[in-house]
């Protein structure tokens, strides 16, 4: 049970992308590849997930459903050590964690993110639910306390960025490919 405009977001290595403005997440690609009208026949995990987010916003979704198990790690997060090794000016990906609050503040888009390996999301979460033997428990207060004890320097990223209005072609939304669901034989 959820909103009727909720969209499941995942990485889809190898998918085709046609003229999607992924610049909110991806910039400064090699060979000056355009990210304001990004096109490829063979997207990486991070570019496909960025495109999936933007396409969901383009169709008016106000709720993104994300599971870290089906996400591109480098799209979702960059830890402090990696930020020190590869400085922002050399990294083309702005991770989702750095944009999720602005996405809500500027566009009213909420995100439900299932994570089991990244406590960094405690810093940006409004609510933290932990599954304890398949029973959901609100652990927001505990998570916020943990986050405050392990404070990190947040990098200012500015605004979320623009969402370009496009006309989606029906053929670009065909449900064929390696993720097509097949009914089992009975």
Region roles according to the model:
Residues 2-41, 77-78:
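P-loop NTPase switch/communication element
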Residues 4-6, 61, 170:
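Active-site lining segments that contact anionic ligands and/or coordinate catalytic metals
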Residues 37-40, 46, 63:
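C-terminal amphipathic alpha-helical segment
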Residues 40-44, 87-90, 107-108:
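Short, flexible loop segments at the rims of nucleotide/cofactor-binding pockets, characterized by
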Residues 44-57:
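Conserved alpha-helical scaffold flanking the Walker A/P-loop in AAA+ ATPase domains
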Residues 56-100, 104-105, 117-142:
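Conserved P-loop NTPase nucleotide-binding/switch module
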Residues 110-113:
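Conserved H-loop
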Residues 127-186:
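Conserved P-loop NTPase
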């Amino acid at each position: 049970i959820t909103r009727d405009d909720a969209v499941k977001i995942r990485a889809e290595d190898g998918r085709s992308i046609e003229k999607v403005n992924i610049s909110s997440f991806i910039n400064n690609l090699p060979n000056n590849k355009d990210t304001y009208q990004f096109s490829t026949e063979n997207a990486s995990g991070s570019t496909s997930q960025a495109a999936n987010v933007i396409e969901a916003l383009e169709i008016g979704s106000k709720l993104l459903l994300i599971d870290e198990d089906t996400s591109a790690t480098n799209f979702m997060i960059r830890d402090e050590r990696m930020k020190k090794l590869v400085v922002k000016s050399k990294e083309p990906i702005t991770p989702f964690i750095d944009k999720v609050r602005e996405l809500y503040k500027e566009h009213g888009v909420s995100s439900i993110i299932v994570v089991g390996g990244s406590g960094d999301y405690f810093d940006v979460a409004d609510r933290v639910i932990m599954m304890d033997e398949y029973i959901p428990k609100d652990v927001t207060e505990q998570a916020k306390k943990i986050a405050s004890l392990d404070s990190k320097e947040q990098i200012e990223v500015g605004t979320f960025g623009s969402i370009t209005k496009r006309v989606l072609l029906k053929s670009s939304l065909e449900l064929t490919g390696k993720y097509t669901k097949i009914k089992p034989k009975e």
